[in-house]
Amino acid sequence: MLRQSFTMGMAKRHMAVKPQLVIGNKNYSSWSLRAWFLLREADIDFDENRISLDTAGTAAQIAEFTQAGRVPVLLLDEVTVWDTLAIAETAAERWPDKNLWPGDADARAHARSISAEMHSGFGALRAGMPMNCRAMGRKVSLPDELTQDVDRVIAIWSDCHRRYGSNEGWLFGDFCVTDAMYAPVVLRFRTYGVNLPESAGFYPRRLLQSAAIQDWLAAAESEIEVIDREERGQ
């Protein structure tokens, strides 16, 4: 049945005239935000296909597009790309004029390193502060592992500001993949009221000014689905 659903999804994709990004709930899906924000902020035109997560039909709906079982998924011509970092690398190759990685080789290596760190690490942050755009003002407990993750994020942002800081406010001066990778962390800190030193505050301020982020937050606010396991704090 999953194979049949996947084949049907492939047929749907081949009829598309532009890239299609399959995402989850905007209130909760941090990985969806990363891919969506990257494409939107870079002014890459795409169709959005939103699937409500954690429902009886979620797995079958996702299986129409990928057998990986997760969102986001980017559908490009004859190619299916899943996993946010793979989508980012593919976008950087497909649209080289968008300069989605820093031009300087050393800065690019740094950007890739901290993007990969976000991709593979920060487990305590994900578990203790799940992305929940509607839960403004909630407080969560801060065990040592979570505090260490928060401190590491602050150190990363502060280091980028010191090394690449500009009036644009992005982590490497101009917008790049890394800004999309850390976008959900900004929204987590916003929800749970994490105080930041000035050295780490430039990037969150810039990100929250983005029209794309404002659109995402407005859409998240209008969603009615509740995923109980993502509801943390008081």
Task: Please provide the spans of the model-predicted regions.
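Tryptophan-centric aromatic hotspots in well-structured domains and transmembrane helices
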Residues: 31, 82, 101, 154-158, ...
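GST-like fold's C-terminal all-alpha helical module
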Residues: 122-209
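Short alpha-helical linear motifs
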Residues: 74, 133-139, 170, 222-229
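Short, contiguous strand/loop micro-motifs
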Residues: 21-23, 49, 173, 190-191, ...
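Short, hydrophobic secondary-structure boundary micro-motifs
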Residues: 98-103, 126-128, 169-171, 198, ...
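Long hydrophobic alpha-helical segments typical of transmembrane helices together
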Residues: 199-234
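GST-like domain detector, emphasizing the conserved glutathione-binding G-site
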Residues: 4-142
